[in-house]
C-alpha cells in the first residue's frame, strides 16, 4: 500500500533534480526575461481550501475557533497567477489605474503589488493588450474564478474589489467597495455568472462606502462580516435580473435573426447558404446529375441517396411481405402500410396518407391550380414530373417494357404494378428501353402489396 502510494506521488511530483533541469531549460529558451509562471512555484503550490456554501456561513454554522482563523489573512507577497487583459466594454469613471500598471504587475518578475493587493483574484478578463495604457474602467469581469491565497475561502467568501494595501481594505476615496457572496461569483451555480454578465456588470460594484480607510479584515467582527455578506448578497439579488441579454441570445443557433428572404416566395432563412439551396425550387435547376441514369437533383445529398438504387443492394427487408429496400427509413415508412397508420390527413376531404409527399401531391388537387401545361394538347398537371411522363404519350416513348407481354410503360411504377397484377411474381426483372440503365429486381413468391393510386392515374385509366 505504501509503495503504491509512493509510486503515485513520484508520478505527480517530479524530483528536485528534474525540476531544476526543466527550469534551467526554460530559462535558457526564454533568455534574460524571467518566466511569469515558474516551474518551482507551480509544483510547490498547495491546494486551495474548499469553499463552504454561503448559507451555512450566514446561519452561523462555523465554529468560533474557525471563524478567527478564517478571518486571518496571510499577508505574504504572492504574485498573482491570473492575467488581467483589457477590453473596451463598460466605462466606469470611479477607477483610475492604468492598464500598463496591471500588465506590468503580471508580466514582470517583481510585481508592484501582490495577490493580497488584489484579494481573491476573481477577475479573469478577455481581450488583447493595446499599445497605449488603458484605464481600469475599460476592464470587465468575464468569468469570476476563486484563486485566493488567503484563508477566506474556508468561510465561503468571495470578495470582488480592488485593494491597494497589504491585507487592508483602504481603497481610494472615489471607489466604493462592496462584498459579493461566493454563490454569485463562485462555481456552485454555473448559471449565475452568465446572468451576472448579461447586465453589463462593472469591475467594482457601486454601493455605499462601508469600509473606512485603514481597516483590516482582522479588525472585523463576525457580526460585521455576516452583515456585509448578507448586504452584498441582497444588493446583487436586487441588481441582477435573470434575463438573457442580446449578447447571449444571439449566440444560440436557434435564436439567430432570419435576415435572408427569398424574393420569389418570401420565405425567410437564417443563413445565405440555406437561401442558395432553396433557389433551385423556383429556377428549376438541377445541377447534380446521376451519371448512370441521367436524373438531375437540386442538392448533392439527394443525389447521394439516389445512387443507392443503382447498387441493387437492398439489405432492409419487410418481415411481413418480404419487400426489400435500400434504406431503413424507407422500410419504416413501408411498415405503415401493414399497420394501417396514415399520419398525414387531408384537412379538406379527410383522406389519409402514409407518406408526406403523397399528402402534398393530394392537396394540390383541392387547390385547382395546374400550372404545368402540355404545349401539344394543353393538358395541365399539378406537378412537373406528371407533365414529364405525359410527354411520352406524344412521342410514343415508353422506356419500360414488360418482359412477359412486351407492353411498354412510361413509368417504372406503372410497369411494376402491371407485373404484380397480371403476371407471375417469378418473372425476370423488367427491361429499360431507351436506356436508363436501371433494373428493378422482383422478389420471388411475394404477396402483392397494396398500392395507392393517385388521382392522375385513376383518370388516365392505369
Swiss-Prot record:
Region (Disordered): 441-462
One Pfam entry name: zf-C2H2_6
Gene Ontology CC, one term: nucleus
Top-rank taxon, per record: Eukaryota
Compositional bias of kind Polar residues: 448-462
UniProt entry keywords in alphabetical sequence: Developmental protein, Differentiation, DNA-binding, Metal-binding, Neurogenesis, Nucleus, Repeat, Repressor, Transcription, Transcription regulation, Zinc, Zinc-finger
Main subcellular location: nucleus
Function: Transcription repressor. Involved in the development of the forebrain region.
Designated name of the protein: Fez family zinc finger protein 1
Amino acid at each position: 500500500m505504501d509503495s503504491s502510494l509512493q509510486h503515485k506521488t513520484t508520478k505527480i511530483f517530479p524530483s528536485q533534480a528534474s525540476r531544476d533541469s526543466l527550469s534551467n531549460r526554460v530559462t535558457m529558451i526564454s533568455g534574460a526575461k524571467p518566466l511569469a509562471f515558474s516551474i518551482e512555484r507551480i509544483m510547490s503550490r498547495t491546494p486551495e481550501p474548499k469553499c463552504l456554501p454561503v448559507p451555512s456561513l450566514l446561519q452561523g454554522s462555523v465554529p468560533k475557533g474557525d471563524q478567527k482563523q478564517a478571518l486571518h489573512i496571510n499577508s505574504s507577497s504572492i504574485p498573482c497567477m491570473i492575467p488581467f487583459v483589457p477590453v473596451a466594454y463598460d466605462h466606469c469613471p470611479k477607477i483610475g489605474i492604468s492598464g500598463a500598471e496591471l500588465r506590468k504587475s503580471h508580466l514582470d518578475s517583481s510585481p508592484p503589488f501582490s495577490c493580497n493587493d488584489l484579494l481573491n483574484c476573481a477577475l479573469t478578463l478577455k481581450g488583447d493588450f493595446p499599445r497605449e495604457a488603458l484605464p481600469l474602467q475599460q476592464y470587465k469581469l468575464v468569468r469570476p474564478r476563486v484563486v485566493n491565497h488567503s484563508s477566506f475561502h474556508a468561510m465561503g467568501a468571495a470578495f470582488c474589489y480592488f485593494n491597494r494595501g497589504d491585507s487592508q481594505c483602504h481603497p481610494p476615496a472615489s471607489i466604493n467597495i462592496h462584498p459579493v457572496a461566493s454563490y454569485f461569483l463562485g462555481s456552485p451555480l454555473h448559471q449565475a455568472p452568465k446572468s451576472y454578465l448579461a447586465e453589463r456588470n462593472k469591475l467594482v460594484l457601486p454601493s455605499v462606502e462601508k469600509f473606512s480607510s485603514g481597516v483590516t479584515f482582522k479588525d472585523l467582527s463576525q457580526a460585521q462580516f455576516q452583515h456585509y455578506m448578507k448586504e452584498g448578497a441582497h444588493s446583487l439579488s436586487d441588481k441582477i435580473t435573470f434575463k438573457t441579454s442580446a449578447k447571449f441570445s444571439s449566440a444560440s443557433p436557434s435564436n439567430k435573426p432570419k435576415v435572408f428572404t427569398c424574393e420569389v416566395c418570401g420565405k425567410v432563412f437564417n443563413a445565405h447558404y440555406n437561401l442558395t439551396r432553396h433557389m433551385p425550387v423556383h429556377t428549376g435547376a438541377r445541377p447534380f446529375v446521376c451519371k448512370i441514369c441521367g436524373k438531375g437533383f437540386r442538392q448533392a445529398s439527394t443525389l447521394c441517396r439516389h445512387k443507392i438504387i443503382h447498387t441493387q443492394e437492398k439489405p432492409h427487408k419487410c418481415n411481413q411481405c418480404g419487400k426489400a429496400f435500400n434504406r431503413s427509413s424507407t422500410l419504416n415508412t413501408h411498415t405503415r402500410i401493414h399497420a394501417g397508420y396514415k399520419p398525414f390527413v387531408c384537412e379538406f376531404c379527410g383522406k389519409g396518407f402514409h407518406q408526406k409527399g403523397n399528402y402534398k401531391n393530394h392537396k394540390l388537387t383541392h387547390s385547382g391550380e395546374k400550372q404545368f401545361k402540355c404545349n401539344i394538347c394543353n393538358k395541365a398537371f399539378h406537378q412537373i414530373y406528371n407533365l414529364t411522363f405525359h410527354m411520352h404519350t406524344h412521342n410514343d416513348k415508353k422506356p419500360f417494357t414488360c418482359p412477359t407481354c412486351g407492353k411498354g410503360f412510361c413509368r417504372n411504377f406503372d410497369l411494376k404494378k402491371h407485373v404484380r397484377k397480371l403476371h407471375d411474381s417469378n418473372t425476370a426483372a423488367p427491361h429499360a428501353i431507351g436506356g436508363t440503365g436501371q433494373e428493378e429486381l422482383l422478389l420471388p413468391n411475394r404477396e402483392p402489396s397494396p398500392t395507392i393510386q393517385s388521382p392522375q392515374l385513376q383518370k388516365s385509366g392505369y
